[in-house]
Regions:
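Non-catalytic, solvent-exposed segments at the cell envelope interface
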Residues: 2-321
Length: 321
């Protein structure tokens, strides 16, 4: 039996209502998801801001610029990366800077330059009145003396510093879920084995062993610095990837316990927005030193030509005379 016209009109009028109701439910679900996402993003933002506030520490250094760098205007800038061997940063023992790297970032050239400084480099220790290994600057006067000494040696300004406890590198690598590196040589250290040319997954303990070995490397301190750069760069890339969002709190916790920096949260946001592309294009440079023994102590002596070469590269990137 066919439907009456009144029944057909009633059914047809109900269909749009059902569609409108379904659309309304869908929009409510989308709204809830957006609110949840917004709260999650705000939670991350708040946690990151809180962590950067805790790890922020200004140090007094000699001013060598006529005017301070302005990263909001995309000025080229420099950072001194210090890997220290004091264990936890709160320990009384000062320790030494096991790793020293200077990075310049220039958005105009869309390039970053990272210079590794051999820790045995013989230079004037500014503020201590001695000529010694550059890594002793940290033992004598902490971050401030290290910054002043590097500024004096390379004849460039150091705008910011980042100090990382090298023993805490284990916690940081574990927090990002491990890193992948390709070993430049075959060696064994602290029970871990690495094969030349073979891609290897490193957890925290393995990364620490990989980046510490020195005496079995034919390139000595240079070889170790190369491996340290590998681990640091792989860790930075992992931190910047979306794959670490789920465990971001572990990452922040590891940074909070093992890192100090003169960068504030707003600085980091500006660098991310204005310098992201340049920071992803890193040129690795090694400051070459010639080994010698003075009064029974081994030093690395940097020839004047080499110092001028590296200093010139950094000045060019910083766009200073």
């Amino acid at each position: 039996m066919s439907q009456s016209r009144s029944e057909m009109r009633e059914n047809s009028s109900q269909q749009p209502k059902k569609k409108r109701k379904g659309l309304k439910i869908f929009l409510i679900i989308v709204l809830i998801l957006f609110i949840a996402l917004g709260l999650f993003v705000w939670k991350i933002y708040s946690d990151v801001a809180g962590t950067t506030e805790k790890i922020h520490k200004d140090v007094k250094t000699e001013e060598v610029r006529d005017s301070s760098v302005d990263i909001s205007k995309k000025d080229p800038f420099s950072i001194l990366l210090l890997g220290v061997d004091t264990g936890d940063l709160g320990r009384t023992e000062q320790g030494r800077s096991d790793t020293m790297m200077v990075m310049t970032v220039n958005p105009n050239t869309d390039k970053a330059t990272m210079v590794s400084i051999p820790r045995d480099t013989r230079t004037e220790i500014v503020g201590h009145g001695t000529t010694d290994k550059i890594n002793h600057a940290y033992a004598f006067g902490g971050t401030s003396m290290s910054v002043n000494t590097v500024q004096n040696m390379l004849d460039i300004p150091i705008d910011y510093y980042v100090e990382v406890n090298m023993k805490g590198l284990q916690d940081i690598v574990d927090a990002v879920g491990g890193v992948q590196v390709t070993s430049p040589l075959t060696f064994s250290y602290e029970g871990y084995n690495f094969t030349e040319g073979e891609s290897t997954s490193l957890d925290g303990k393995t990364a620490l062993a990989y980046s510490r070995m020195r005496y079995d490397d034919p390139n000595g301190d240079y070889g170790r610095q190369e491996r340290q750069r590998q681990v640091i760069q792989a860790t930075l890339e992992k931190v910047a990837s979306l794959s670490t969002i789920s465990n971001y709190q572990d990452i922040l916790g590891s940074l909070e316990n093992n890192m100090q920096t003169s960068l504030e949260f707003n600085d980091m946001v500006k660098i991310f927005n204005n310098y992201r592309s340049a920071a992803g294009n890193i040129e690795q440079v090694q400051l070459e030193a010639e080994g010698t023994t003075i009064d029974g102590i081994y030093y690395g002596i940097v020839p004047d030509e080499e110092m001028s070469r590296v200093s010139g590269l950094l000045k060019e990137q910083l766009e200073i005379n």
